């Protein structure tokens, strides 16, 4: 169960970073 939770948190962190990256790209393109 601990490993599952760790994977879940890692996935959330990855999604957050990806979202921020997309935002930065949009701002730079503007």
Swiss-Prot record:
Broad class of where this protein is predominantly found: membrane
Membrane spanning residue stretches: none
KW NAD (keyword) present: no
Alphabetical keyword list: Cell inner membrane, Cell membrane, Cell shape, Lipid-binding, Membrane, Stress response, Toxin-antitoxin system
Locations listed in the record: Cell inner membrane
Taxonomic superkingdom: Bacteria
GO cellular component: plasma membrane
Entry's Gene Ontology BP terms: regulation of cell shape
Induction per the UniProt record: Constitutively expressed, increases slightly as cells get older. Does not respond to acid, rifampicin, tetracycline or Ni(2+) stress. Antisense RNA expression decreases strongly under oxidative stress (H2O2 or paraquat), while aapA1 expression decreases only marginally in H2O2 but decreases strongly in response to paraquat. A decrease in antisense RNA leads to an increase in toxin production.
Activation and inhibition: Transcription of the aapA1 gene generates a full-length transcript whose folding impedes translation. Processing of the 3' end of the aapA1 message generates a shorter transcript that becomes translatable after a structural rearrangement. The processing also makes it more susceptible to forming dsRNA with IsoA1 which leads to duplex RNA degradation by RNase 3 (rnc).
GO MF entries: lipid binding
More details: Addition of an SPA-tag or GFP to the C-terminus of the protein renders it non-toxic, but detectable by antibodies. As Helicobacter ages cells change from a helicoidal shape with multiple flagella at one pole to coccoid forms by 70 hours in culture. As they age peptidoglycan muropeptide abundance alters; GlcNAc-MurNAc dipeptides increase while GlcNAc-MurNAc tripeptides decrease.
Free-text note on domains in this protein's UniProt record: Has 3 regions; the N-terminal 8 residues are disordered and not required for toxicity, the central helical segment (residues 9-28) probably crosses the membrane, and the charged C-terminal 2 residues which are required for toxicity.
Functional note: May be involved in response to oxidative stress. Toxic component of a type I toxin-antitoxin (TA) system. When overexpression is induced in situ in the absence of its cognate antisense RNA antitoxin IsoA1 it leads to cell growth arrest and cell death without lysis. Neutralized by IsoA1 RNA which forms an extensive duplex with the mRNA. Binds artificial prokaryotic and eukaryotic lipid membranes, with 30-fold higher affinity for prokaryotic membranes. Molecular dynamics suggests the peptide penetrates the membrane leading to lipid reorganization and thinning of the bilayer.
Family named by the database record: Belongs to the AapA toxin family.
Name of the protein: Toxic protein AapA1
